[in-house]
Amino acid sequence: GDYDAGVLIHEGQLTFQDQGLVLLRDLGEWWQTENDGLPLPLGGNTVRRDLGDLIPRVSQLLQDSIRYGLENRVEAVEYALQWGRDLSVEQADEFIGMYVNERTLDYGDDGRLAVKLFLEKAHKMGIIPEMPPLDFQR
């Protein structure tokens, strides 16, 4: 159909111009402007609290997997291209680099603060019923 505006996610961030679309506002830049330069939290890896003593092990396995991908970038990009939705190797590499990087391993102090702020805003707006407890594994 025809629409006046929309939000582009995933690969669309890199390919929207190929479809004749025009960027009106970058939500990441908007968030940073509105929130003292904090990064926009787009996702994260979570582990269920009821796993108890297994949490550190699961966290380490996730870290190891992410680190492997970072250290073996070509292999990781080639693997990810299976789901790349017609991206070139260069586009896939750029897209992966936007979301899988050193911040994936450690959000940093500003990243942790951004996650907390994001959830606080969601709670105040009634999007989530209560503020969840946050534990960041490093």
Residue positions per predicted region:
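Flexible, active-site-adjacent loop/turn segments at secondary-structure boundaries
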Residues: V22-E29, G43-N45, M98, R103-L105, ...
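Conserved C-terminal helix/tail region of periplasmic/extracytoplasmic solute-binding proteins
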Residues: K121-R138
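Secondary-structure end/capping motifs
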Residues: G52-K121
